Swiss-Prot record:
Organism classification: Bacteria, Pseudomonadati, Pseudomonadota, Gammaproteobacteria, Pseudomonadales
Keyword rRNA-binding: no
Membrane topology: Multi-pass membrane protein
Name this polypeptide is given: Disulfide bond formation protein B 1
Stretches in topological domain Periplasmic: 27-44, 86-142
Originating organism: Pseudomonas aeruginosa (strain ATCC 15692 / DSM 22644 / CIP 104116 / JCM 14847 / LMG 12228 / 1C / PRS 101 / PAO1)
GO biological process: protein folding
Disulfide topology: C36-C39, C101-C128
Amino acid sequence: MPLASPRQLFLLAFLACVAIMGGALYLEHVVGLEACPLCVVQRIFFILIGLTCLAGAIQGPGLRGRRIYSVLVFLLALGGGATAARQVWLQTVPLDQLPACLPSLDYMMQALPFQEVIRLVLHGTADCAQVSWTLFTLSIPEWSLLAFVAYLGFSIVQFLRRA
C-alpha cells in the first residue's frame, strides 16, 4: 500500500513551492537581498511548478492526467534547473570576465523588445554571479538547483507510479 496518494503528493509539492517562495520573499524583504534577473526567472519557474502541482492536487486526476501533470512539472523543473545551473556556473567565473550589470527588469521590459530582454536575462551579469548569502556553504542558486532536481525526481516518481 502506498504511503500517500498522488493527490497528496501534488499537494505536498505545492506546499514546498509555497515554502520556497516564502523563503525567497523573506530574503528579499526582511534580509534585504536584491533578486537578480536569473533569480526572478527561477521564481517564475517555482510559481509555475507550484500552480501545476496545485491543479493536480485539486483535480485528483487519473493515471493519464497525473502523467500529464508530471510531464509539465518535469519540463518546468528542467527549465528552472537550467537557469539555476547557469547562475551557479556564473558564480565560478572570474568577475572581470562577466558582462556588466543590467538595468532593472522593469526598465528593460519597458525599453527593450521582449526577445532582447529574455536574451539579456538568460545571459546573466555580474549581479547574478555575486554570492551574497549562504546556508551550509551553499549559495541561493545552489539551493534552488537542488530544489529543481528534487522536483525532477518527484515528477518521475509521479509519472511512473501506477496507483
